[in-house]
Amino acid sequence: MTEDLKWSNYDFTKIPFDDIVSVGQRTLLYRDIFTVSWLLGRFCNYKCSYCWPYARSNRKDHRPTELCLKTIDEIKRQARENGFNSFHFSLSGGEPTFHPGYLDILQHLAADAANTNYTSVHMTSNCSRNMVWFEQYVEAVKPFHRASITASLHTE
């Protein structure tokens, strides 16, 4: 995508199911899991020289939270129409915790967890947010069957 394209406002709910990559992992927990890997934005509060240039952006070009929620609903609707009812969402960026609606996105995903066979969420983060933020994160992920974090080590 070019810089001229306002991808932060792109309506991802219009993507046909056949263009969404899904992975059924029968060896993982013995069920098909629809996996979504989502880069929530390029902004990162660290500017490490060894990180990929995409993630060293100062641009806070996050998609609007409401559009993210609609996209989640559409992905799940299409996945369910195609026989999936177990989901794994992997959220990264830049630094995903700086998406202004990150906790809202988690709460939206969690609200549907009871209606699924299995729902998990994973975050790759530099863990730079304060403890109050992480306390809110812990509360937001309680409804999930599983939640995990990969902490990035930053030596610069």
Annotate each PLM feature.
Residues 39-43, 50-54, 91-94, 150-156:
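Short loop/turn segments at strand-loop or loop-helix junctions that form parts
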